[in-house]
Amino acid sequence: MAPSIAQNEHINGEVKEVLWNLCKKQNYLPLNWEMAADSLRGSKLDQVKKMVDEFRKPIVKLGGETLTVAQVASIANVDNKSNGVRVELSESARAGVKASSDWVMDSMSKGTDSYGVTTGFGATSHRRTKNGGTLQKNLIRFLNAGVFGIGTESTHTLPHSATRAAMLVRINTLLQGYSGIRFEILEAITKLINSNISPCLPLRGTVTASGDLVPLSYIAGLLTGRPNSKAVGPTGSKLDAEEAFRVAGVTGGFFELQPKEGLALVNGTAVGSAMASIVLFESNILAVMFEVLSAIFAEVMNGKPEFTDYLTHKLKHHPGQIEAAAIMEHILDGSSYVKAAQKLHEMDPLQKPKQDRYALRTSPQWLGPQIEVIRAATKMIEREINSVNDNPLIDVSRNKAIHGGNFQGTPIGVSMDNTRLALASIGKLMFAQFSELVNDYYNNGLPSNLTAGRNPSLDYGFKGAEIAMASYCSELQFLANPVTNHVQSAEQHNQDVNSLGLISARKTAEAVDILKLMSSTYLVALCQAIDLRHLEENLKSVVKNTVSQVAKRTLTIGVLGELHPARFCEKELLRVVDREYLFAYADDPC
């Protein structure tokens, strides 16, 4: 008799538990379940603080397995750092790198057949050759197919910050000793980075599978001294390969690539993952910044602070939402504006809305999932920049070359598409808040367009800024469309599916730039709103003092010196002052 569904589930559950306990006992987790779970534990804010601390460190030490998004961003932004930052290679990696390089040379001499060493490339891998060095030289030649504009910073040249980051990521991969390349080549690339010399790479031309072949070939072209190779020096001047080597202090002349070395340099996801690292470093900071801006928005809008109540968010269970609410609650705690708003809400409560609009009240619920997406993408990219992502992989311990597809940059394309959608959602909420802030129908007593001029018929404040914000938000929403569903079969249908990782990362970089524009505009508007609330507070204080003094003189004592019942009108008059929107004069037709 066949077992029931319930029996099957019970048996499967016991098997899973036995396997799990066995894995834990032997310290063997083949799918890294526990590591993946641990990576998303803890506070997102603490993670961002740690990222900023790492970004500020003067040295990036590479060993192949501990590179972070913040370190990649640090190398990318070396132009903007007063003290610079240097890369150091782990000497302990030298032996493993040398072993894989020696294995390739030994296998070549023994006649072992390996892809890209004795064969052609891609769809033409059926071809064979014994001229391994010449094969690598021609690999670089045919991959140098990029198109550049005029000048060192043309719109068709990859930003030099991204190039430096890509060199760092590629070194980190090659240090792990599975790629068959000499350690001296990695040292030369390190010298280029430390001298702030960036090879000129084309902005476009890669599908990030098989890796970022075309752009990475220009790094290889500089190392081998190809005549078309150009670089940009520390002062922004254009250098040829010979000048770049001299400035960087690379001695011994250009490299004559040995078998597999050209493939090791170009067949990886370094450019896409480097750009993604830069994007995610900034995205994490922008997400935290918007949590702060949302709290300020609640403050200047006289919002009801209960939207951050811990029980509400605890019952929803989502960690991003819980932390966003906690951060906003911390910022609002003790705010004099919040206390003043509480008094206003208690005055004539039945004549006012019971709760705030969604842009304020549900901001933690809206932001939380976006923050979780950005955080998950950050972890995915950190795994990618510490991965070995070329082909074939040299396994010296088993004396074999493994042919696979780690060059497929799907983690980059998917994480960047998701990040871009999260950024667009953040921008959407920001625009909704901005629209409420400048609209006197919604902003609880602030002047229309946040104007503070004497003549409201001439001063229109943030009207132009609101139009600009609409433009930014529209473009940001367009960029939220995915890139990865636009795959085209490439290279004679060998690369019939590809990740489009760098393209997606580039589009996400555009989204980050637009969100920066929105954030800076919004911050200025919030500062204006704070000033207006402070002005409102001061003016009300002056008016109330004046009303109180006049009331005491004119309403307290009668003609014959007796106490006048009208003295009790003082409290009512002061309440009228509190109820009145101070800036209502701006649209008063009188």
Swiss-Prot record:
InterPro entries: Aromatic_Lyase, Fumarase/histidase_N, L-Aspartase-like, Phe/His_NH3-lyase_AS, Phe_NH3-lyase, Phe_NH3-lyase_shielding_dom_sf
EC primary class: lyase
Location(s) in or outside the cell: Cytoplasm
PTM notes: Contains an active site 4-methylidene-imidazol-5-one (MIO), which is formed autocatalytically by cyclization and dehydration of residues Ala-Ser-Gly.
Enzyme Commission number(s) from the entry: 4.3.1.24
Main localization, broad class: cytoplasm
Cross-referenced Pfam families: Lyase_aromatic
Disulphide bond pairs: none
Catalytic activity from the UniProt record: L-phenylalanine = (E)-cinnamate + NH4(+)
Binding site for (E)-cinnamate: N267, Q355, R361, N391, K463, E491, N494
Assembly and binders: Homotetramer.
Protein name: Phenylalanine ammonia-lyase 2
